[in-house]
A protein has these predicted regions:
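Conserved CoA-thioester-binding segment of acyl-CoA-metabolizing enzymes
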Residues: 7-8, 16-80, 120, 380-390
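Glycine-rich beta-to-alpha active-site loop
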Residues: 122-166, 189, 193-194, 198
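A structural preference for short, pocket-lining loop segments at secondary-structure junctions
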Residues: 42-45, 60-102, 117-132, 154-157
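Amphipathic alpha-helical blocks and their helix-capping loop/short-beta junctions
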Residues: 206, 211-289
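Long, low-complexity C-terminal extensions of enzymes
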Residues: 268-277, 286-387
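Gly/Pro- and small hydrophobic-enriched strand-loop and loop-to-helix capping segments
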Residues: 148-171, 203-220
Length: 390
């Protein structure tokens, strides 16, 4: 089974409530933090923005995980969403768009630095860490859920990495986990941005358990009461059935194993038989994406196969630092904010015009320095013995 860092799949009454943090004057942070007996409870609570993640939200998440790691009161952490159908829509594009319009590239870089640093902190956090996802989870939302000890999906779960559609690339650890998915499925998801449900996510080991959302409260109660979480989750887990990608796996493996994006598109265009309609639709979808981002994602996942998570995050910070200064990033974010009917105008507009040397330069260290990650153990983790003795 494909596992994330640390071997996990990709994915006395002590009460204290910490709410009302302020992100800006008059604007709530968008996350509620609560300590309910032995559980740290995180609720994404920014429904008007579909739980889009801001720099302040990443900082607050990191602060609380660092606070809870050594706490003798906390057995584990559970994360949930207040929105009925969205867990998180990813990064806060409205704020990123405003910064891009202002030329505030330093602020954008710090946003991505905070996001990638939080992913690394989660990799080092060994207490039970259980996101409960029963809705759409995109981009940055995947980054705050995939690297825990467990990842629980309900029937409403949908996951997608749509970043190439905004002139960016599949980040937040995508270099690491997408490159390790079976049968070139990671590249397929990266280039198309298509969403998958719980059945495909379970087969690809992007979630650890499929549990009907009606039982999520049982999981929260168990963490609060210090009950062993693995046995409980295994008992609640249900067979999610066969996913949409299962039948397509041979075609994905055959087509997306080609040596360039252009060759992939040629194979999709030439496909016939039972997969012809899927292939034509997939090719059309890919051609709506930023040509530069398509090339970046292809090269990124090729490199990611041999990288550790830490090195993958460092590579992503390099890419982010360079891409935010390019026209496609501002154009892509702007078109997404504008909504349907506003098609992005990519520069260059077609794959044939993308300069391969410029793609290679995007992987070079940024002028503001590399992403610094502490790879020592112990700062945000405790031993299994401590977990059983507290």
């Amino acid at each position: 089974m494909l596992a994330g860092p640390g071997g996990a799949p990709f994915c006395g009454a002590y009460t204290n409530s910490v709410k009302g943090d302020i992100q800006a004057v008059g604007e709530p942070l968008g996350i509620d933090f609560e300590e309910n007996n032995r559980a740290g409870v995180i609720t994404l609570n920014r429904p008007s923005r579909l739980n889009a993640l801001s720099r302040e939200m990443f900082d607050a998440l990191s602060e609380h995980y660092q606070r809870w790691a050594p706490s003798p009161h906390i057995y584990g952490v559970v994360m949930q969403s207040s929105h009925p159908s969205v867990f998180s829509s990813g990064g806060d594009l409205k704020t990123l768009h405003a910064w891009s319009e202002q030329g505030a590239l330093g602020a954008i870089r710090e946003f991505y630095r905070a996001a990638y640093s939080h992913v690394w902190l989660l990799e080092k956090f060994i207490r039970p860490n259980v996101p409960l996802i029963n809705g759409l989870v995109l981009g940055g939302g995947i980054g705050i859920t995939l690297y825990g000890t467990h990842c629980v999906a309900g029937e409403g779960y949908r996951l997608a990495m749509p970043q190439v559609g905004i002139g960016f690339f599949p980040d937040i650890g995508g270099t690491y986990f997408l490159s390790r998915l079976e049968a070139h499925t990671g590249l397929y998801l990266a280039l198309t941005g298509r969403a998958i449900g719980p059945a495909d996510a379970y087969r690809l080991h992007l979630i650890s358990h499929y549990v009907p959302a009606a039982h999520f409260h049982v999981i929260k109660d168990a963490l609060s009461d210090n009950h062993p979480i693995d046995r409980l989750l295994d008992g609640l887990h249900r067979d999610p059935g066969e996913g949409e990608l299962a039948r397509l796996t041979p075609a994905i493996n055959r087509i997306f194993g080609m040596s360039s994006v252009e060759e992939i598109l040629d194979r999709l265009d030439a496909e016939s038989g039972e997969d012809e309609a899927w292939a034509k639709g997939t090719a059309a979808e890919i051609r709506t994406k930023s040509p530069t981002s398509l090339k970046v994602a292809f090269a990124q996942l090729r490199r990611g196969k041999t990288l550790s998570l830490a090195d993958a995050l460092r590579l992503e910070y390099r890419l982010a630092s360079h891409l935010i200064a390019r026209a496609d990033y501002g154009e892509g974010v702007s078109s997404r904010i504008a909504g349907k009917g506003r098609e992005p105008r990519w520069h260059p507009a077609i794959l044939a015009e993308v300069d391969e040397a410029k793609i290679e330069s995007l992987f070079m260290p940024p002028v503001d320095g590399e992403l610094e990650l502490d790879e020592r153990r112990g700062e945000t983790s405790i031993s299994p013995r401590q977990l059983t003795e507290t």
